[in-house]
């Protein structure tokens, strides 16, 4: 999400925050970070989480418009700059991973975005970039912590669920929101984030109790998006609806925001089929690509993977993008969005929406671009 003074910060009394600059729809001049590719993206689940009949095969694609602001202590302790400290302080073996409450923070940071992927849950969070202008603003920390605590809450709930009991993703997100508030407020770390997540579950057949089918619980706050594509019909069977306060100011969770999961999050339940592809995307994707462009790119990536166009050597069935194809799907979609984002003359959905609001805008929208692609498969584990 771009640095936008039109975020919820603009609604905060000036007695709490410094004066905000006037919003201008001018092209940002951030130097793009190197695109990052990850071979393994599925996080390890807790040992006591039950095995479900279905699972996700996942892949991610990330592009950051600028380097993320480093997490502050105690979440990340940077090495001292004093030459009087022991040399071990600066040694490469020193642990620079991010922690909260003694645990490694799950997921990956991408500029102000954060993503998470596991066998049963994926999410994409978009931190509000305007916090980068505040000395204690850490939107990237907020987006990462919400994903971390949300995934933990979902796994804890899943471990305690009775058979056939439905999950409650809004309650899990509310718990994550409250834990993030507690963790950041005590250290004066400010920020807000939008979020979307998709939790995979299942249901029993009405007539044949031995028959199970996959079900997806999708939860959204703001303008990230979950989209479900059925390659067998080449159709989008579901996508979330963006939530706005006003143009370019989505609903968001965090410092000084009136939005909360219990009050503003929307959850939908979708019947899935094995082979369906679930996407969790930041607005860096949907602001630069129309729906039909996303669908076309996904279908092409899957077809290329099935035909062996990609050079990666993967054993096993490649049908529908299995055994590594989701990594290619996510990276290809990220690359398609990036090409538009950096093109000052491209036509984009964001440009179209801005013009509808009477605002001057041209080209793509340079933003952090985060994609999590997940393929629904039977769980043979």
Spans of features found by a protein language model:
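PP2C/PPM-type serine/threonine phosphatase catalytic domain
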Residues: 2-381
């Amino acid at each position: 999400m771009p640095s936008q003074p039109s975020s919820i910060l603009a609604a905060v009394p000036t007695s709490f925050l410094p004066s905000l600059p006037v919003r201008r729809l001018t092209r940002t001049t951030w130097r793009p970070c190197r695109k990052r590719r990850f071979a393994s993206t599925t996080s390890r689940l807790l040992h006591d989480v039950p095995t479900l009949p279905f699972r996700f095969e996942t892949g991610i694609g990330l592009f950051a418009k600028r380097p993320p602001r480093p997490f502050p202590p105690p979440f990340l302790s940077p090495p001292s700059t004093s030459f009087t400290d022991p040399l071990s302080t600066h040694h490469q073996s020193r642990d620079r991973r991010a922690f909260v409450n003694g645990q490694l923070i799950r997921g990956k940071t991408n500029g102000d975005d954060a993503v998470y992927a596991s066998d049963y849950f994926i999410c994409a969070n978009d931190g509000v970039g305007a916090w980068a202008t505040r000395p204690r603003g850490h939107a990237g920390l907020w987006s990462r912590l919400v994903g971390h605590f949300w995934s933990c809450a979902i796994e804890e709930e899943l471990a305690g669920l009775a058979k056939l009991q439905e999950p409650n993703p809004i309650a899990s997100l509310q718990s994550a929101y409250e834990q993030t508030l507690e963790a950041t407020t005590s250290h004066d770390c400010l920020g807000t984030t939008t979020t979307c997540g998709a939790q995979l579950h299942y249901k029993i057949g009405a007539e044949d109790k031995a028959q199970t089918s996959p079900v997806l619980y999708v939860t959204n706050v703001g303008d990230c998006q979950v989209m479900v594509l059925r390659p067998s019909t080449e159709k989008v069977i579901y996508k979330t609806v963006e939530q706005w306060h006003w143009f370019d100011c989505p609903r968001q969770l965090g410092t000084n925001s009136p939005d909360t999961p219990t009050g503003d999050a929307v959850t939908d339940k979708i019947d899935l089929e094995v082979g369906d592809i679930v996407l969790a995307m930041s607005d860096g994707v949907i602001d630069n690509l129309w729906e039909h462009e996303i669908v076309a790119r996904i279908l092409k990536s899957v077809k290329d993977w099935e035909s062996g166009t990609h050079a990666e050597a993967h054993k096993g069935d490649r049908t529908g993008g299995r055994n590594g194809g989701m990594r290619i799907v996510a990276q290809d979609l990220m690359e398609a969005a990036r090409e538009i984002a950096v093109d000052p003359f491209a036509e984009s959905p964001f440009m179209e929406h801005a013009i509808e609001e009477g605002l001057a805008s041209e080209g793509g929208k340079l933003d952090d671009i985060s994609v999590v692609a997940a393929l629904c498969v039977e769980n043979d584990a």
